[in-house]
Design a protein with these regions (language model features):
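HIT superfamily nucleotide-processing domains
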Residues: 1-104
């Protein structure tokens, strides 16, 4: 699957669509979902052009991968849902059969 520069996450990363930012560094952006499925529903997305988690893990630099997963833990602590606060769930929808709606 080819990366689409006009997907909603790419537009959020470029600042064309606003988001309620939680955390950002050189590699990731985290923000609240506009249609939350739970009381706390945060997204953590890489800033690189990857279509899904498989593409990211296979093609990103080790530093990008490290910073992505480190950011997930950091955001969980910020939102007070880390393992010491009761826990959280991570989810990545991959491709059509995995329920992916936006290829990013």
């Amino acid at each position: 699957m080819k990366y689409d520069d006009n997907n909603i996450f790419a537009k959020i990363l470029r600042g064309e669509i606003p988001c309620k930012k939680i955390y950002e560094n050189d590699y990731v952006l985290s923000f609240y979902d506009v249609n939350p499925q739970k009381k706390i529903h945060a997204l953590v997305i890489p800033k690189g052009q990857y279509t899904d988690l498989d593409d990211f893990v296979q093609n990103a630099k080790e530093k990008e991968i490290y910073e992505f997963f480190k950011a997930i833990s950091h955001v969980a602590k910020m939102l007070k849902v880390s393992n010491v606060d009761g826990g959280y769930r991570t989810l990545s929808n991959i491709a059509n059969n995995g329920g992916q709606e936006v290829p990013h």
